[in-house]
Amino acid sequence: MTKSQQKVSSIEKLSNQEGIISALAFDQRGALKRMMAEHQSETPTVEQIEQLKVLVSEELTQYASSILLDPEYGLPASDARNNDCGLLLAYEKTGYDVNAKGRLPDCLVEWSAKRLKEQGANAVKFLLYYDVDDTEEINIQKKAYIERIGSECVAEDIPFFLEVLTYDDNIPDNKSAEFAKVKPRKVNEAMKLFSEDCFNVDVLKVEVPVNMNFVEGFSEGEVVYTKEEAAQHFRDQDAATHLPYIYLSAGVSAELFQDTLKFAHDSGAQFNGVLCGRATWSGAVKVYIEEGEQAAREWLRTVGFKNIDDLNTVLKTTATSWKNK
């Protein structure tokens, strides 16, 4: 599937001059509210959430090729971003219905690909929870849903970034060794599926195919994968798609995420960048709540800057241009 010139131009706006997507993710809503609530007794306000997103955008977008925001709380932050920083906007509702089976996808009802584009987005991003081992009844609904969004994005001639998060309803803890054993197949098979032309996905935003905390040499406890087994899972991931793909940071520490990217590269993965969120800015939340705006700004200018600068340095030697795909 060849991309239109407009889509190519839009993805270029989201990338650096080397064709690598070094994007800052701050479309968190439910997760952010929970993080903020850990440091204050009252419910986080809309004003607090919006202001924190603005602070991160003002201080860090000069070092990112693009920023991912949500249209619920992130529009002031989109206006505050650096002029050279591209914009992705999230199209999905945050979280999923824990009382219903299947983690079915849901769009923000007052938004469309057209409206996100009119808001200034260079790409539409949608998050899908997917388990290749779920029932066909569940998965056929998800496939149809993604086909719809893909068609919308084709109609609007705007890139479609699909984020896939894997799960297993029979393994409630996705950080467990039990889930680590099934994760590689789930991640790589989902990538293979959504690379099919019928979905019109332009860029995949994906998990790394292993839990690095269980890789030999990275693990402090139980080892699920030897280094060579882990490396093979990265190679299998690379072979699973012809599309550009970028890694999400999944809330791990900045140091572990950077080490993961080095391991991926050394394994032979031709990934095309990152959408890195909490690994860059999470420490600012506590400072913002407990010490205020100016202290949070100072944190972002020092620790936050170091996190994103170190990440950019790692990307220079590990990621490859999406234009090679």
Swiss-Prot record:
The keyword rRNA processing does not apply. One of its GO terms (biological process) is lactose catabolic process via tagatose-6-phosphate. Pathway: Carbohydrate metabolism; D-tagatose 6-phosphate degradation; D-glyceraldehyde 3-phosphate and glycerone phosphate from D-tagatose 6-phosphate: step 2/2. It comes from the Bacteria. It catalyses: D-tagatofuranose 1,6-bisphosphate = D-glyceraldehyde 3-phosphate + dihydroxyacetone phosphate. Its EC number is 4.1.2.40. Pfam families: DeoC. GO terms for molecular function: 6-deoxy-6-sulfofructose-1-phosphate aldolase activity; tagatose-6-phosphate kinase activity; tagatose-bisphosphate aldolase activity. Keywords: Lactose metabolism, Lyase. Gene3D superfamilies: Aldolase class I (3.20.20.70). SUPFAM superfamilies: Aldolase. Disulfide bonds: none annotated. Belongs to the aldolase LacD family. NCBIfam families: lacD, PRK04161.1, PRK12399.1, PRK12858.1. HAMAP family: LacD (MF_00734). This is Tagatose 1,6-diphosphate aldolase. The lineage of its organism: Bacteria, Bacillati, Bacillota, Bacilli, Bacillales. The gene is lacD.
